[in-house]
């Protein structure tokens, strides 16, 4: 069975724009706001949202990317290192963090990202933005900003394509 495209380029751009407007509304602009993208695709989505925030509000929002590999609960022997050098690490203490990822599924990636954020500082607030929420949560985690809810079967997968890596913007259900 072929993959089914559920978001094309235009739909993906509209979803990111909607998320951006919701972030502006919730945060009353961009004061004390930091966008944190979960590597790899969340990082690129965070940078795009920051660009839109600058276009709409005229403010530059800091963006940081985090690698949560060492905070995953299926790798208990890891040593909780973010792999960031001091130039890449932003001061997130007392900041309003918007954590950004491409797909929300079981919630385990987000749990690991929360652990990673707390490891480097004490944010004032943390909210979650995802391009796609596909359901099937294993942990009590809910996104504050969702581009598109796409219910899937347990055996299906969601594949997000971003221009920066894949040469196109799209979301597909993989059977």
From Swiss-Prot:
Keywords: Glycosyltransferase, RNA-binding, Transcription, Transcription regulation, Transcription termination, Transferase. It catalyses: UMP + diphosphate = 5-phospho-alpha-D-ribose 1-diphosphate + uracil. The keyword Glycosyltransferase applies. GO terms for biological process: DNA-templated transcription termination. Coiled coil: none annotated. It holds the Pfam family Pribosyltran. Its EC number is 2.4.2.9. InterPro entries: PRibTrfase_dom, PRTase-like, PyrR, PyrR_bifunctional. One of its GO terms (molecular function) is RNA binding. A motif (PRPP-binding) lies at residues 97-109. Homodimer and homohexamer; in equilibrium. Regulates transcriptional attenuation of the pyrimidine nucleotide (pyr) operon by binding in a uridine-dependent manner to specific sites on pyr mRNA. This disrupts an antiterminator hairpin in the RNA and favors formation of a downstream transcription terminator, leading to a reduced expression of downstream genes. PANTHER family: BIFUNCTIONAL PROTEIN PYRR. Belongs to the purine/pyrimidine phosphoribosyltransferase family. PyrR subfamily. This is Bifunctional protein PyrR. The lineage of its organism: Bacteria, Bacillati, Bacillota, Bacilli, Lactobacillales.
